[in-house]
Amino acid sequence: MERITRADDRVHRPAGPWTPTVHRLLAHLHEQGFVAAPEPIALGDTLETVSFVPGVAGEYPWTEDIASEAALVTSARLLRQFHDAAASFPRSAEDDLWSQADRAPVETVVHGDFAPYNCVYDGIAAVGLIDFDTAHPGPRVWDVASAVYRFAPFTTGTVEGSTTADLAERLARAAEFCRAYALDDRSRGVLAETMIASLVAFVTTIEHEAAAGNPKFVSDLQHGHADLYRADVAYLEQHAAAITAAVA
């Protein structure tokens, strides 16, 4: 299995059947002035080459900078800028091939895994967005729900986050993310159920891909990620009404 490597200002990554479409998306983003994404450089049979996005990814455990309100707010604004730029991507039923099926209602091209670890930071400011392998057409709230789940965070475990915040703080961070993104009222009303749906879909993906022998997902399953997400689904279901009220 190919690995991600960096040489100077270029990053070499494993390519998939969807990579040509992702490269067209990345080129479109830059044409629209969204320069926070990598630029496509080359595409081979098994590897793609994109530009390196300078900064620090928000990996776990979070630093004080990544856990800050400023990092949350700038991440939300970055997501909004990405969605606005991607909305005009010229889609083609004949040429497009994404790693995931379209999700209705299609409003833009969503990132598919918007989280701190796929954002790049300069101190407390989100300045870049990477890893577009899961991009696909869909509703804006699909990405916002994933982001709120990660940034609040609404996880019950300690593997995926840093210091666990109390519910009131999580709700406040969720509301702040929605404000910074300028999420519409309809999407706010379905945010909690969309978070739950996205986690259920992710568990299904982990189990399906692990059964097919995908080494990444075999590892995820062995490390209890599916069980963690199931626990998070139960937590979200328990507090769905409070989440909906907080972000309204």
PLM feature spans:
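ATP-binding pocket architecture of kinase catalytic cores
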Residues: 1-111, 115, 122-125
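Catalytic activation segment of kinase domains across protein kinase-like and atypical kinase folds
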Residues: 98-99, 108, 115-153
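Amphipathic alpha-helical interface surfaces
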Residues: 78, 122, 140-143, 170-173, ...
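Short, surface-exposed acidic
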Residues: 183-193
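ATP/Mg2+ or Mg2+-diphosphate-binding catalytic cores
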Residues: 202-248
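Short, polar/flexible loop-turn hinges at active-site or ligand-entry regions and domain interfaces
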Residues: 61-65, 136-138, 156-161
